[in-house]
Amino acid sequence: MSNHAAGPTTNDPTNDPTIKALVARIDQDADPNHADITPAVEQLGELGPKVIPYLGDALNAKDELTRLHAQRALERALERHFGFVPGQGWTKPDGEARFRALWIKNGNYDADGAEPAREASIKAWLTWSSTQRS
C-alpha cells in the first residue's frame, strides 16, 4: 500500500518533508520502559491528523513493532484532535468518547491484527483524513 504519487504536487497530501522524516525515524530510540513510544511517535502525535496520510505504509508494515509505533502515532494525533493535552487530560467534555467512537467506526486498528482488518482500517483512516484538511 503506497501513499506516494509519481511526484510531489500541491494536491499530494504527503509532500511535507518534516513529517516524512519523522515517519522514517518512527522506530528509532524507543523508550526503554515503553517500547511502543519513540521520539518520532510523540512528535507525529503533536502534529495532529495531518500526519495520517503519511502513516499508511507504516501502519501496514511487515514489522509488528513498526506497525505498533504507527498505531501509537495515529492514536496520539487523534487524541490531540479531540482535545487531549498531556499533563491535563481531555480538555473537551466529549473528547474521549468522540475519539473512541471514531476509532471503532474506522476499523478499530490493531497493529497485531489480521492483515485484511488492518488494511480496511487504514483505508478508512485515509478516507477520514482526506475530509479533515483545512
Set out the residue ranges of the language-model regions.
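Eukaryotic acidic, Ser/Thr-rich intrinsically disordered low-complexity regions
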Residues: 109-134
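Short coil turns that connect the paired helices of HEAT/ARM alpha-solenoid repeats
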Residues: 27-35, 59-65, 90-100, 112, ...
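Amphipathic alpha-helical scaffolding segments comprising HEAT/armadillo-like alpha-solenoid repeats
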Residues: 12-27, 49-60, 81-91
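Positively charged, low-complexity intrinsically disordered regions
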Residues: 5, 73, 81, 99-101, ...
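Structural detector for internal amphipathic alpha-helices that build alpha-solenoid repeat scaffolds
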Residues: 2-3, 7-12, 31-49, 57-60, ...
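Leucine-rich solenoid repeat scaffolds
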Residues: 75, 79-91, 101, 105-111
